[in-house]
Structures are given as structure tokens and as C-alpha cells.
A protein has these predicted regions:
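N-terminal, positively charged nucleic-acid-binding surface of large information/translation enzymes
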Residues: 44-130
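Alpha-helical recognition segments enriched in aromatics with Gly/Pro capping
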Residues: 11-61, 76, 147-343, 349-356
Length: 399
């Protein structure tokens, strides 16, 4: 937190308390077989020693805002919790650098799309590092997986789950809304909102989606058996996940707004291609962050930027503001929430500095294993003090 020197409230940056918290070295506090079985989304997930986590990354066309950050801080909390429980997380966080929105942003900037994407990715990674979010083990970029998408398209065609028309390959998606519990009308609305082109006349059904999209003049394109084109959004993620992890993952994580259409089609394509179900043992759909009751959007002028938050508060306070609630909960950002988080962080640090007769940290493990119940874990740590408070601060990246 000293990296945020001069940016936080005095109590939050107390160096004595910081040194107390840092007395905890490492997070592996359980012997093999002794740790509680973690649960995500109410689903118990027994592990031996490794967890495969696919995190839907950014489309690098703009600055990182709080809505983005919330998802990645929660994913970081999940991976740290697993590590604390003796399970090594293997995280794959992709970069969607082949996308219509990115292409349009690069055109407006007068910059080649790949150079534009690389610069935005750099800024994103700087913001994540400033928030204390660990870098993933794997960081695939979509443009490097074009051949894998072509193989995916060919396999779906061979199985009759897709069809080729006018240089594109479409996945039959009528069943996809059911994966998200949606009626057809709502699925069509979301498909249009997220660039699914339900009005494309080449489709057999408006809910079909492009695995391979025929090229348009002046847009990025690659050769394929169906002509020049580019990967579809959902197919990119499916191809990257299957390439990195094989037939499936333990946890697929991302913002709740990605549940449909993106995650539903990604999983459907993966399961259809491999024949293995389920593609994901559990889903971590992080709640949406709004401001003034509205979804953050550049067009609305209401973005809350990570870099602006970190100019006034230490990263630990921003992380605690994000984490001190249920991970699936939607919430509305207000500046006073940061003040409340900073005050709660001071109480946690004070508790960490107290002597406590009981240095057993397993209570923290049980609470975090129970679907990442961070609020209850913080309450317990503040009440108990000592080693549990120090350990929790370490696990949640609040030290």
C-alpha cells in the first residue's frame, strides 16, 4: 500500500499495522486433506491440487472502469482463497483483440487495430497490477487463435451443429437461451444489444451465431475454407479455452452481463464440439456495477475509472469496497462507499495488531470456502483479531 503513498487516509496507511499484517508469509495454511471443500455458486467443488479457471478478459478498446475491475478483483479473491486452501489455481484470462467494437475504435483513432489493442491491453494490465490483481498463467489473445477457431467451425459443421452460408459459418443456437433461463424474446433483445446480428438474413434462425464471419471491406480478415473472414466472438473464447485447458474448466468467471449471450454460446459450442458436458463445473458471474442507477458506458459519460479511484485511495480500500458484499450482487457505486471501505479496513488492521489467544485461522478458511463469504469473514476477523485478521488481509490482498 505504500505504492499509494499520499493517496490514502492516514489510518489506512499506518506502517505499524502494515508490518503486523505482513508478518503472515504465504497463504498455504492447510495440510493436505484438511481444508474445507470450496463452493462456488452453491456448487461444491472438490479438488485434488489444481483448479482450472477461465476468466473472460477485456476487449481492449477503452480504459478500465470499475465495472471491469470488480470482476477481476473477485476472480483474484477466488484464486487466492483456493491457494489458501492448498489448491493451485491455473488461470487463463483472454484478450478479445478481434472484435467489431475494437476495430471501430481503432479506426476513429487512426491506428491499426492490433497496435491500438496492444496499447489498451498495456493500460489494462497496469491498472490490474495497481489493484494487486495477479497476472494469469495464460493470457491468450484472440488473433493468435484464428486457426483453432477454423478447426472449431469445421468440427461443428461435421457434426451438423453449424451450417455454412455466404462465406460465414453459423452455429445453431435455438437452445442457447435455455442455458441462461431466458425466454426467446429476451434472448433476441440481448443478442441485438451485444452485436449478435439477429437480423442477419443469412441465418436460418435469428438466434444462430457466427462461428466464422465473412469479411467486410477494410476489416481484419484471415483465409479460411469458406473464404476470407474472422472469428466470431463466442467462438474465439471457446477455441482459446479448449486450446489451453482441453475439454473443460472447473470455474468459468466473468461479469454477470456476459451470462447471455456470450457464456451460453461459448459453453454450447465447447460441449457440442467435444461431446463432454458440462463444459464448466461452476460459473462465477460477478454482479454488475452501476453508477447513479445506470450501467457504466462511455457514451453515457458515467465511467468510474480505476486510475481515478487509485489517485485518492489505496488499492486495499478499493478492493475491500468491491469484495465486502456477495460476489453475485449488483451494486451502485457512490464515493462514500470508498470512505466506508477505508474505515472498515482500519478496523481490520487494528484487529490484526491485537493479541489474540486463539491463532487458529481455519475459521477464515471455512467462511471463504463457503461461496467466498467475504463480509462474514471480515466480521469474524475484526471480532477475533490476531492471526485470523492478519491471514484474511493477506488472502484478500488487503495488506
Amino acid at each position: 500500500m505504500e505504492g499509494a503513498a499520499g493517496r490514502g487516509h492516514a489510518g489506512v496507511t499506518d506502517t505499524r499495522l502494515m508490518s503486523i499484517v505482513h508478518e503472515v508469509s504465504g497463504t498455504a495454511s492447510y495440510q493436505a486433506g484438511a481444508s474445507p471443500v470450496p463452493a462456488v455458486g452453491g456448487r461444491r467443488l472438490p479438488f485434488l491440487d489444481r483448479a482450472r479457471i477461465y476468466a473472460c478478459g477485456i476487449t481492449p478498446y477503452d480504459v478500465t472502469h470499475l465495472g471491469h475491475a470488480a470482476a477481476f478483483v473477485w476472480i483474484d479473491a477466488l484464486t487466492s482463497t483456493l491457494r489458501f486452501l492448498g489448491i493451485e489455481p491455473e488461470v487463463c484470462r483472454n484478450i478479445t483483440d478481434v472484435d467489431d467494437v475494437l476495430d471501430e475504435a481503432a479506426r476513429r483513432a487512426g491506428t491499426p487495430y492490433d497496435s491500438f489493442a496492444a496499447v489498451q491491453q498495456y493500460h489494462f494490465e497496469q491498472d490490474m497490477a495497481a489493484l494487486g490483481v495477479r497476472a494469469p498463467v495464460h493470457g491468450p489473445r484472440a488473433h493468435r487463435y484464428v486457426q483453432q477457431v477454423i478447426r472449431l467451425a469445421a468440427g461443428l459443421l461435421d457434426g451438423g451443429a453449424a451450417y455454412a452460408r455466404e462465406g460465414s459459418v453459423y452455429f445453431r443456437g435455438q437452445a442457447a437461451p435455455g442455458r441462461a433461463g431466458l425466454e426467446r424474446a429476451e434472448a433476441l433483445r440481448l443478442s441485438a444489444e451485444y452485436g449478435g446480428r439477429p437480423d442477419d438474413p443469412a441465418k436460418e434462425d435469428p438466434l444462430d451465431v457466427a462461428v466464422w464471419q465473412a469479411s467486410e471491406p477494410g476489416h481484419p480478415a484471415w483465409d479460411s475454407p469458406w473464404g476470407a473472414g474472422r472469428p466470431g466472438w463466442h467462438a474465439e473464447c471457446a477455441a482459446m479455452a479448449l486450446s489451453v485447458f482441453g475439454v473443460g474448466v472447473d470455474v468459468h468467471a466473468g461479469g454477470k452481463d456476459l451470462r447471455f449471450p456470450h457464456h451460453a454460446y461459448h459453453a454450447a459450442m465447447a460441449e457440442t464440439f467435444t461431446g463432454v458436458t458440462p463444459y464448466a463445473r461452476a460459473w462465477l458471474h460477478v454482479g454488475t456495477v452501476t453508477t447513479g442507477g445506470a450501467k457504466m458506458a462511455k457514451s453515457a459519460g458515467n465511467l468510474v475509472l480505476v486510475r481515478d479511484l487509485l489517485a485518492g485511495y489505496p488499492a486495499a480500500a478499493v478492493r475491500l469496497m468491491i469484495l465486502d458484499r456477495g460476489w453475485a450482487d449488483d451494486w451502485d457505486y457512490r464515493p462514500d462507499l470508498l470512505d466506508a471501505a477505508a474505515a472498515r479496513l482500519e478496523r481490520l488492521y487494528s484487529a490484526a495488531g491485537r493479541w489474540a489467544a486463539d491463532d487458529d485461522v481455519t475459521g477464515i478458511g471455512r467462511l471463504l470456502a463457503a461461496d467466498l463469504n467475504v463480509p462474514a469473514a471480515i466480521d469474524y476477523a475484526i471480532e477475533t483479531g490476531g492471526a485470523p485478521a492478519r491471514m484474511l488481509a493477506t488472502v484478500l490482498g488487503l495488506s
